[in-house]
Curated annotation (Swiss-Prot):
Formation of the three residue Trp-Tyr-Met cross-link is important for the catalase, but not the peroxidase activity of the enzyme. The formation of the Trp-Tyr-Met cross-link is autocatalytic. Consists of two related domains. The catalase-peroxidase activity is associated with the N-terminal domain but no definite function has been assigned to the C-terminal domain, although it may play a role in substrate binding. The active site is at H108 (proton acceptor), W321 (tryptophan radical intermediate). It catalyses: H2O2 + AH2 = A + 2 H2O; 2 H2O2 = O2 + 2 H2O. It comes from Mycobacterium tuberculosis (strain ATCC 25618 / H37Rv). Bifunctional enzyme with both catalase and broad-spectrum peroxidase activity, oxidizing various electron donors including NADP(H). Protects M.tuberculosis against toxic reactive oxygen species (ROS) including hydrogen peroxide as well as organic peroxides and thus contributes to its survival within host macrophages by countering the phagocyte oxidative burst. Also displays efficient peroxynitritase activity, which may help the bacterium to persist in macrophages. Might be involved in DNA repair. Partly complements recA-deficient E.coli cells exposed to UV radiation, mitomycin C or hydrogen peroxide. Increases resistance to mitomycin C in E.coli cells deficient for either uvrA, uvrB or uvrC. GO terms for molecular function: catalase activity; heme binding; metal ion binding; NADH binding; NADPH binding; oxidoreductase activity, acting on a heme group of donors, nitrogenous group as acceptor; peroxidase activity. The record marks R104 as: Transition state stabilizer. Disruption phenotype: Cells lacking this gene are devoid of catalase activity, supersensitive to H(2)O(2) exposure and highly resistant to the antitubercular drug isoniazid (INH) in vitro. This mutant strain is markedly attenuated for virulence in mice and displays impaired growth in infected macrophages, but its growth and survival is indistinguishable from wild-type in macrophages lacking the ROS-generating NADPH oxidase (Phox). The lineage of its organism: Bacteria, Bacillati, Actinomycetota, Actinomycetes, Mycobacteriales. Keywords: Antibiotic resistance, Heme, Hydrogen peroxide, Iron, Metal-binding, Organic radical, Oxidoreductase, Peroxidase, Virulence. It is an enzyme of class 1 (oxidoreductase). GO terms for cellular component: cytosol; extracellular region; peptidoglycan-based cell wall; plasma membrane. Induction: By treatment with H(2)O(2). Repressed by FurA. This is Catalase-peroxidase.
């Protein structure tokens, strides 16, 4: 689902009787008002210009990787440990240790990740900003971040908030006796919130995201607006552990977790700390974004008792899971299976479970030295016992706690790194040597790279192979454009365009030219590598990109431009065994406006899906525009469809797409085929061009038309070629973290 696009309504006007779409009054731009209020269905091109350089106070020359490398990680760990074990009167620590709070903070930062579009996760430090900083599920995490300010203040630019939030959770586990799998620094702070689609609901805890029996809308993972994953009281507050298990399995699957990882994360996370529901929830004040100015960014101020410590209210549930809440052990499972449970309510009125018939009364310590408590559990905790699959997993851990420790360590490591992309992006001394399958491994370069002479020779072989400009450009685009800037997955490196599942994706036209291109490039690779001197070799992945570059040079020459398209060798080839088919399946594009492809079941019209794709490719509006225009004239459309190919000189890198789109002698109308396409007719009424919604939006939308006019001018051809090549090179190298 695209980012920050309002629902598409049947009309462009609102409910006002005079036809004006704005009900009430217009807001100042500084209040958030603007054109979107008047025309809610207009394309929001701002999603292509998020976190601009001018908003970054560190400046363009700032090198976070270099700064974080100077940190003494042992000293940093000690500083965090001191914060964790020093209770502050303004927010007293349960059991004298903030570790459980920091685990929750890290979990909730990373746990927003969802597989279907790769958005969410801990990168960027998004938990600091709206809406995440004010989600009901993140209540009181504002205090956790304030507790860490002395550490952030000390290390300043050397340590990002994004890294600190997650590393504090890792340190908390270690502080309480758990051995973690490792940690990678490298999360760079952003300075404004990502405009992410979190759901259609306009109220907290709304659940309009479901249809049918319990079908959750893609790409969402959480069950309700404002929750990280599932409702701890059960589906919509129905405290049915078996029904909750259904939500748990689906939500965690959409967070990239299997059943074992899911169970391990729940058991491991709930080995520590407690929930907070000391009194009536209606005594809790507004979230940070709605709180009074004088609260200085803190929210959820409670008027129940002291509002803190023993009187704290967060989720409204009052559960302490174990009798050792600041120590790693197997007590969660021992208690879960050691008692029978009955449904009760917390002092705040929330559903929870208590050990039946008063069993275990007094065995659970109070966080502030009060009388001992009875064992308690969440409805979702009991799901691990009543669901047959989770029950089989967790009962084994009850007898084999060392297996639980191993699985939790790996699952936690995956949780907090899933949005970081390949391990090449992990920094610091705590990065494990082992690379895991979910990290989409690619082999290290084990040969000498091709130089200028070899590159020139390979280009000649590719051009003489019989492959067309269209075939070569389409294949290179298919490989590289699988990249997602959200979770840094995909891209041309690894050469996975020839592996399952990518080779079979509908958007890649697997029964068309793709397999022919693959075979031909493999033959060129084999021939070159067998004859090249010394240890010089070329990978298939490099050849795919080089083929596209060679084709663009040929097309530019046909248009009268002698250019050299940049090419940086160094990609390697992954094997099918290094490729998790199920994990890669979610990268399959359901729409790619750059190729004029629109699959079935998309939630929005094609032009909105184009913006979403461009956003995932980290493209600006000018880059998106020049790429669409160039790819059209190069014949890179899905199945070579003529839609948007506004030129008589296909496979020639001209600005014809823009020139002909702006031609006032062409009249556009919907196709009589009623297939969502359009016909452009000349003055005689003859159909001259056909186009898609993606094509026509560049003439219809005022901002995009302004860009088209740049590239459609009489003097624009050189600039068009230059800008197209630059944008092409950017996409080809989006996954080259080894060189950038």
């Amino acid at each position: 689902m695209p980012e920050q696009h309002p629902p598409i309504t049947e009309t462009t006007t609102g409910a006002a009787s005079n036809g004006c779409p704005v009900v009430g009054h217009m807001k100042y731009p500084v209040e958030g008002g603007g054109n979107q209020d008047w025309w809610p269905n207009r394309l929001n091109l701002k999603v292509l210009h998020q976190n601009p350089a001018v908003a970054d106070p560190m400046g363009a020359a700032f090198d976070y990787a270099a700064e974080v490398a100077t940190i003494d990680v042992d000293a940093l760990t000690r500083d965090i440990e001191e914060v964790m074990t020093t209770s502050q009167p303004w927010w007293p620590a349960d059991y004298g240790h903030y570790g459980p709070l920091f685990i929750r903070m890290a979990w909730h930062a990373a746990g927003t990740y969802r597989i279907h579009d790769g958005r969410g996760g801990a990168g960027g430090g998004m938990q600091r900003f709206a809406p995440l900083n004010s989600w009901p599920d993140n209540a009181s995490l504002d205090k956790a971040r304030r507790l860490l300010w002395p550490v952030k203040k000390k290390y300043g630019k050397k340590l990002s908030w994004a890294d600190l939030i997650v590393f504090a959770g890792n340190c908390a586990l270690e502080s309480m006796g758990f051995k973690t799998f490792g940690f990678g620094f490298g999360r760079v702070d952003q300075w404004e919130p990502d405009e992410v689609y979190w759901g259609k609901e306009a109220t907290w805890l709304g659940d309009e995201r479901y249809s049918g029996k319990r079908d959750l809308e893609n790409p969402l993972a959480a069950v309700q607006m404002g929750l990280i994953y599932v409702n701890p009281e059960g589906p919509n507050g129905n405290p049915d552990p078996m029904a909750a298990a259904v939500d748990i399995r689906e939500t965690f699957r959409r967070m990239a977790m299997n059943d074992v990882e899911t169970a391990a994360l729940i058991v491991g996370g709930h080995t520590f700390g407690k929930t907070h529901g000391a009194g009536p929830a209606d005594l809790v004040g507004p979230e940070p974004e709605a709180a009074p100015l004088e609260q200085m960014g803190l929210g959820w101020k409670s008027s129940y008792g002291t509002g803190t410590g023993k009187d704290a209210i967060t989720s409204g549930i009052e559960v302490v899971w174990t009798n050792t809440p600041t120590k790693w052990d197997n007590s969660f499972l021992e208690i879960l299976y050691g008692y029978e449970w009955e449904l009760t309510k917390s002092p705040a009125g929330a559903w929870q479970y208590t050990a039946k018939d008063g069993a275990g009364a007094g065995t659970i310590p109070d966080p502030f030295g009060g009388p001992g408590r009875s064992p308690t559990m969440l409805a979702t905790d009991l799901s691990l016992r009543v669901d047959p699959i989770y029950e089989r997993i967790t009962r084994r851990w009850l007898e084999h706690p060392e297996e639980l420790a191993d699985e939790f360590a790996k699952a936690w490591y995956k949780l907090i790194h899933r949005d970081m992309g390949p391990v090449a992006r992990y920094l610091g001394p705590l990065v494990p040597k082992q690379t895991l399958l979910w990290q989409d491994p690619v082999p290290a370069v084990s040969h000498d790279l091709v130089g200028e002479a070899e590159i020139a020779s390979l280009k000649s072989q590719i051009r003489a192979s019989g492959l067309t400009v269209s075939q070569l450009v389409s294949t290179a685009w298919a490989a590289a454009s699988s990249f997602r800037g959200s979770d840094k997955r995909g891209g041309a490196n690894g050469g996975r365009i020839r592996l399952q599942p990518q080779v079979g994706w509908e958007v890649n036209d697997p029964d068309g030219d793709l397999r022919k291109v693959i075979r031909t490039l493999e033959e060129i690779q084999e021939s070159f590598n067998s004859a090249a001197p010394g240890n010089i070799k070329v990978s298939f992945a490099d050849l795919v990109v080089l083929g596209g570059c060679a084709a663009i040079e040929k097309a530019a020459k046909a248009a009268g431009h002698n250019i050299t398209v940049p090419f940086t060798p160094g990609r390697t080839d992954a094997s099918q065994e290094q490729t998790d088919v199920e994990s890669f399946a979610v990268l399959e594009p359901k729409a790619d406006g750059f190729r004029n492809y629109l699959g079935k079941g998309n939630p929005l019209p094609a032009e909105y899906m184009l913006l979403d794709k461009a956003n995932l490719l980290t493209l600006s509006a000018p880059e998106m525009t020049v790429l669409v225009g160039g790819l059209r004239v190069l014949g890179a459309n899905y199945k070579r469809l003529p839609l948007g190919v506004f030129t008589e000189a296909s496979e020639s890198l001209t600005n014809d797409f823009f020139v002909n789109l702006l031609d006032m002698g062409i009249t556009w109308e919907p196709s009589p085929a009623d297939d969502g396409t359009y016909q452009g007719k000349d003055g005689s009424g003859k159909v001259k061009w056909t186009g898609s919604r993606v094509d026509l939006v560049f003439g219809s939308n005022s901002e995009l038309r302004a860009l088209v006019e740049v590239y459609g001018a009489d003097d624009a051809q050189p600039k068009f070629v230059q800008d197209f090549v630059a944008a092409w090179d950017k996409v080809m190298n989006l996954d080259r973290f080894d060189v950038r």
